[in-house]
């Protein structure tokens, strides 16, 4: 079993919720990268984005380098972590990267856009991001798991992947 599991995917695909459950069930530590960034900077993700997306992405890259030092951990990354090739390389070279692929219609029906700075323009923005990032997520991962059913089924599928790697 790999001792670092990185969950990637669109905002609202279930990375944090699923990651927490998997970590608990496999007795691993859980880290939400966005929370790490907020604690490190004493600012919310939205406040950081107000200083520009490039500014935020630089902090995200620094955080990527820092979190790979942890062992026996499940890490829910930020949805845009794959926008920088250096982050993809860092994640892929240091653990098992799983893309949680959730149908965009389900993301739209569930997501709270007020907490997601890049999604505040609503449905069209989410669809645009999905189209922009989908192939990048596929390239950035070792395994793809579709989150189109229940959380229990997705958790079970990811746990099998983790245990068999």
From Swiss-Prot:
Chief location bin: cytoplasm
Residues that, per the record, bind substrate: 34, 57, 79, 133
Binding site for ATP: 12-17, 116
Cofactors that this protein relies on: Mg(2+)
Intrachain disulfide bonds: none
Pathway where this protein functions: Metabolic intermediate biosynthesis; chorismate biosynthesis; chorismate from D-erythrose 4-phosphate and phosphoenolpyruvate: step 5/7
Molecular function terms from GO: ATP binding; magnesium ion binding; shikimate kinase activity
Coiled-coil regions listed in the entry: none
Top enzyme class: transferase
Key words of the record: Amino-acid biosynthesis, Aromatic amino acid biosynthesis, ATP-binding, Cytoplasm, Kinase, Magnesium, Metal-binding, Nucleotide-binding, Transferase
Compartments reported by the entry: Cytoplasm
Catalytic activity: shikimate + ATP = 3-phosphoshikimate + ADP + H(+)
Domain of life: Bacteria
Cellular component, GO annotation: cytosol
InterPro entries: P-loop_NTPase (IPR027417), Shikimate/glucono_kinase (IPR031322), Shikimate_kinase/TSH1 (IPR000623)
Family named by the database record: Belongs to the shikimate kinase family.
Subunit comment: Monomer.
Protein name as catalogued: Shikimate kinase
High-level lineage: Bacteria, Bacillati, Bacillota, Clostridia, Eubacteriales
């Amino acid at each position: 079993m790999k001792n670092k599991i990185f969950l990637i995917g669109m905002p609202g695909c279930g990375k944090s919720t699923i990651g927490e459950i998997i970590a608990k069930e496999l007795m691993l530590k859980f880290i939400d990268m966005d929370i790490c960034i907020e604690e490190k900077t004493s600012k919310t993700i939205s406040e950081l984005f107000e200083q520009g997306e490039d500014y935020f992405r630089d902090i995200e890259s620094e955080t990527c380098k820092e979190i790979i030092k942890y062992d026996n951990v499940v890490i829910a990354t930020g949805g845009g972590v794959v926008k920088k090739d250096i982050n993809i390389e860092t994640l892929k070279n240091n653990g098992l990267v799983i893309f949680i692929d959730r149908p965009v219609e389900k993301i739209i029906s569930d997501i709270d856009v007020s907490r997601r700075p890049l999604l505040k323009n609503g449905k069209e923005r989410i669809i645009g991001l999905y189209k922009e990032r989908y192939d990048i997520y596929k390239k950035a991962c070792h395994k793809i798991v579709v989150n189109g059913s229940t959380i229990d089924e997705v958790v079970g599928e990811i746990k099998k992947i983790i245990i068999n790697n």
